[in-house]
């Protein structure tokens, strides 16, 4: 079995790292460059940087901050938020990103995933999916499952999350970053049923995101959810745990990690 990755996530707005609950109630967590350097030193396998209001605000990519973060980080860096075009991929790669993450733009124009992966290779094209479990009323008419939300979780697209992940991989996505909006920031653990459903449906790595409150939650995402990597923010940002502690817990549970 390949080593499983632990990926701290920097949600950035206004040039600061923030963390919310269910995509709302944002709380300041610090300077992105300082935090990125800390995770690099702690032995994180990768880092994900998401400009969480770029799309909803209609803003351009914040290249100076991305360049500053990339200069401090010597592990793979994924950048998302406001990535709209194939040209944006080139700009981010030039700024120091290793992978770029599409979300709302892929929903508006799925062909961008074909075009970007053909030009730069699927290994650097990630599709982020923000998914929310259907309400009992919706499930009664459409069946149980999860819908895809766009614009920072503000808009229900009506797309089924598992079907959307499958289509994105078919179009060339090399990785799926799967966030449970229901669990985001709640510290109640991943939505393991969602993680498992998508992991079983696609043949590329799935990164589980949304809800980590303990080190065992990370291991559960791999062992029960079937994820290839686990992403967390709150438990790392506020000093509750280090990446090293997370790797030690995963190793103790029999999960291969990079040491």
From Swiss-Prot:
Family membership, please give it: Belongs to the HisA/HisF family.
Complex formation: Heterodimer of HisH and HisF.
CDD domains in the cross-refs:
HisF
Q: Where in the cell is it found?
A: Cytoplasm
- This protein is called Imidazole glycerol phosphate synthase subunit HisF
Highest classification ranks of the organism: Bacteria, Pseudomonadati, Pseudomonadota, Betaproteobacteria, Burkholderiales
Q: Active site located where?
A: 11, 130
- For the keyword RNA-binding, the answer is no
Top-level class of the enzyme under EC nomenclature = lyase
The task this protein performs is described as: IGPS catalyzes the conversion of PRFAR and glutamine to IGP, AICAR and glutamate. The HisF subunit catalyzes the cyclization activity that produces IGP and AICAR from PRFAR using the ammonia provided by the HisH subunit.
**Principal localisation:** cytoplasm
Any Pfam family matching the protein: His_biosynth
The UniProt entry's GO CC annotations, sorted and at most eight, read:
cytoplasm
């Amino acid at each position: 079995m390949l080593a499983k990755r632990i990926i701290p996530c920097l949600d950035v707005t206004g040039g600061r790292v923030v963390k919310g609950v269910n995509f709302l109630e944002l709380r300041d967590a610090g300077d992105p460059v300082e935090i990125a350097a800390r995770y690099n030193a702690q032995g994180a396998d990768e880092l994900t940087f998401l400009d969480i209001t770029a799309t909803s605000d209609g803003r351009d990519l914040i290249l100076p901050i991305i360049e500053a973060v990339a200069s401090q980080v010597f592990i793979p860096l994924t950048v998302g938020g406001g990535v709209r075009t194939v040209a944006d991929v080139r700009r981010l790669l030039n700024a120091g990103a290793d992978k770029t993450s599409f979300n709302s733009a892929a929903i508006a124009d799925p062909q961008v995933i074909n075009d970007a992966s053909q030009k730069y290779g699927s290994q650097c094209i990630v599709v982020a999916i923000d998914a929310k479990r259907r309400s009992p009323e919706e499930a009664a008419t459409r069946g149980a499952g999860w819908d895809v939300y766009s614009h920072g979780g503000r808009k229900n697209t009506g797309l089924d999350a598992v079907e959307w992940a499958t289509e994105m991989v078919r179009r060339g996505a090399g990785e799926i970053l799967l966030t449970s909006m229901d669990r985001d920031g709640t510290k109640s653990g991943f939505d393991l049923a969602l993680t498992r459903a998508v992991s079983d449906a696609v043949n590329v790595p799935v990164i589980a995101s949304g809800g980590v409150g303990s080190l065992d939650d990370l291991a559960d995402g791999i062992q029960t959810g079937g994820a290839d990597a686990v992403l967390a923010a709150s438990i790392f940002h506020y000093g509750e745990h280090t990446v090293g502690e997370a790797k030690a817990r995963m190793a103790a549970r029999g999960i291969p990690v990079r040491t």
